[in-house]
């Protein structure tokens, strides 16, 4: 499956050979002090720098050392922008091939497996994640997630180690791989009769996957806290007042332990950052809905959620927010109903 999917990915997402570094690529590679080995930065120092090569006290909160390791390695060979873009396309094809294998292991239907890989390789959720150089973080994070799904087919004694390694790989590629922590155990619960029809042991496999994914998350946070000691956000550095409810105090303590670097509030880059919570949720639901429609009907592509593509909404209830909420709720509920039936 890898070869034909690679051809399709190349046809759909390859930029012109004369392409240059555009938008964030200039900051990620040309101005990245780690990639350019400025200031005596060693190869291993990626663990002490953020995605843009900045130290903890200047970071915007993106801790992704694995893409930096890859960039530094390839940068020593070539600085040609087309090459750095092209291997991103090939990684996307590799993800599609791996998803094809996972689908076949689950269904034993070759045609359906090829269809899943074809849909995945042709309908990237974000074109920027495949055709843009900085999208390597998304692609590698996706590789970790799909590899974790593939690990569920391993014997019970080996599966936790595979899930642990895959989730850890995804987390060090991009923070959004955090979604694997709850989703992979859920997938283990659902897929156990398909991957191990003679001895499904749903609860045991799901618990093992949860322990493995949770251990990967804890190790990731502890290593990031030690290797990348970023400043504590002001809202977390301030102690909670006396009488704070236990649930809120527990959430505060969890966020302090997680120690996410302060995120920038730039309305031009992310207009939802200055919106209140209800309007932020409504705007996020609209982003989700538009992303889904762009996958199926890519008439007008929006590279990201920055202004003016996705300005903060002026009301809470509108078609985009309602459709986004419906598409978040209905597919899981429908899948659950089909599973029970």
Where are these regions (language model features)?
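Polytopic membrane enzymes that build or remodel cell-surface glycoconjugates and lipids
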Residues: 1-341
């Amino acid at each position: 499956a890898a070869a034909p999917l690679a051809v399709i990915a190349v046809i759909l997402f390859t930029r012109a050979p004369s392409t240059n570094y555009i938008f964030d690529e200039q900051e990620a590679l040309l101005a990245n002090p780690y990639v350019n080995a400025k200031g005596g930065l060693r190869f291993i120092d990626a663990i002490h720098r953020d995605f843009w090569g900045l130290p903890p006290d200047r970071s915007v909160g993106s801790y992704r050392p694995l893409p930096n390791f890859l960039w530094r390695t390839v940068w020593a060979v070539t600085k040609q922008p087309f090459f750095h873009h092209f291997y991103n396309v090939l990684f996307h094809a590799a993800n599609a091939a791996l998803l094809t294998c996972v689908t076949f292991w689950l269904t034993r239907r070759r045609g359906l497996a090829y269809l899943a890989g074809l849909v995945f390789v042709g309908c990237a959720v974000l074109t920027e994640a495949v055709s843009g150089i900085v999208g390597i973080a998304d692609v590698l994070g996706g590789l970790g997630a799909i590899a974790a799904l593939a690990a569920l087919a391993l014997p019970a004694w080996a599966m936790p180690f595979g899930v642990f390694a895959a989730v850890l790989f995804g987390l060090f590629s991009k923070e959004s791989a955090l979604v694997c922590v709850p989703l992979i155990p859920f997938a283990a619960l659902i897929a156990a009769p398909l991957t191990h029809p003679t001895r499904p042991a749903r609860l045991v496999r799901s618990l093992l996957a949860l322990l493995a994914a949770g251990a990967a998350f804890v190790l990731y946070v502890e290593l990031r806290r030690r290797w990348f000691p970023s400043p504590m956000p002001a809202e977390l550095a301030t102690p909670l007042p006396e009488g704070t409810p236990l649930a809120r105090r527990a959430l505060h303590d969890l966020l302090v332990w997680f120690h996410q670097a302060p995120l920038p509030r730039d309305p031009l880059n992310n207009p939802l950052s200055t919106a209140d919570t209800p309007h932020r949720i409504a705007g996020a639901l609209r982003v989700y809905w538009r992303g889904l429609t762009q996958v199926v009907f890519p008439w007008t592509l929006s590279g990201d959620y920055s202004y003016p593509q996705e300005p903060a909404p002026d009301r809470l209830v509108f078609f985009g927010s309602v459709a986004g909420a419906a598409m978040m709720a209905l597919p899981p509920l429908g899948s659950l109903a089909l599973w029970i039936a």
